[in-house]
Amino acid sequence: MSILTVENVSHGFGARKILEDASFRLLKGEHVGLVGANGEGKSTFLNIITGKLMPDEGRVEWCNRITTGYLDQHTVLTPGKTIREALREAFQYMFDLEREILELYEKMGDVPESEINAMMEDVGDIQNVLEHNGFYILDSKIEEVANGLGLGDIGLETDVGNLSGGQRAKVLLTKLLLQNPMILILDEPTNFLDENHINWLKNYLKEYENAFILVSHDIPFLNDVVNVIYHVENAVLTRYSGNYDEFQRMYQLSKQQTMQAYEKQQKEIEKLEDFIARNKARVATTNMAKSRQKKLDKMEIIEKVKEKVKPVFKFREARASGRYVFQTHNLVIGYESALTGTLNISLERGQKVAIKGVNGLGKSTLLKTLLGIQKPFAGEVRLDDYLYSGYFEQESERYNSNTALDEVWNDYPGMSNAEVRGTLAKCGLTTEHITSQMMVLSGGENAKVRLCKLMLKDVNWLILDEPTNHLDVDAKDELKRALKEFKGTILLVCHEPEFYEDWVTEVWNVENWTTKIV
């Protein structure tokens, strides 16, 4: 039974087609992966099915009495509430029922005895609903899911107003899982999770009995949890049975068959056109030429497979730094309180170091402290005199009205319009992307613009905070290649070991430094 049906949906922005005549169905219990390159329309599709965007054409039909949950990272968490209080909101309807029971008890003192039996029956019915839905063990349910996603490490009594972006995303995801909707819609849920919590979520989704739609560029994760793939490319949405690896096999085979059919047809067209050109003017053969022309006119032309432009990343190298890029002396990082013990660490020229560890332990804070953006809680950082650093920040400005072109041009005003456009195009951005505002670009397109700015700078030290978040498979592979090739020093925060394991020289685990219990 289809619980969500999308029929003949088309949508575009200006002259650019995002979806054309797209159809989609979601069956009960199906685990769907929605895949495609950055900017192909995955987020647009999610916005259409959740009612945030009206399609230009087509219809979206939900089955009656279906509950849905959408991981929207822009949802507001009210400061002043603890994490536990925010998570308890997932069960608000049960707390409303509990309040109804209390109100019934209060009214019993003011009604005739003849009405009390009916009211007691109502109380019993409500209590049965609450017991059936586990109301009286809610806190243990909350703690189970919260601990699985690492919120227990932060502390459930922590004010949500004090959380980092990654911690906030964890709260939203945990709340959504606790709601247990009939359709779960997840857009890049692993971006702010470390390895242990990704594995927990993977196991949770594998056992999830309801349906979900998942957007993720984390292929190992996707492979393990989905049984259907919908692929969006060149505005066309196509359904494949199986996981991502099976989709890739069928997709490549289909592409190969289409290319072979295209080449065969082109040869036939060439022969027909040659025959027509040689014979249409001769009286003896003009009828045969007309016959061939009719055949040509009726032919259904096979379109050549469009190859997506893949990004090319290359970082410009400045003169070499001294032996030590940085050294710390009794460094402690933190804000109101210390996040680590004393750190006496150093990074040597040419080293490529990945930093891992659960969220909230200070990975981003360490980078900012080393760069002088954040003051040390205690101790000091000694930087080399000949450093040319390039910093990729994890979270970009949300309401940036600059176009991608202006975003780069403002930083490099000496470049011509054509040079800026050319560099952005190398990063895999189209003309439409280049002239779009940063705040309307997808997460992956936004990341490519910021990587473009880094590529134009002479650097001998790259500091990258979760650069793979939002990047599609091709962009991620190309970034990995470029970082392998880079001759300078790299300090990388990343939650994907498969991205860095085969090229870094060392891995630092912040869990070994933290003052918190992990």
Map each language-model feature to its residues.
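ABC ATP-binding cassette signature C-motif
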Residues: 1-258, 309, 318-518
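Post-kinase regulatory C-tail/linker adjacent to protein kinase catalytic domains
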Residues: 313-315
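Intracellular alpha-helical coupling/juxtamembrane segments of multi-pass membrane proteins
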Residues: 250-305
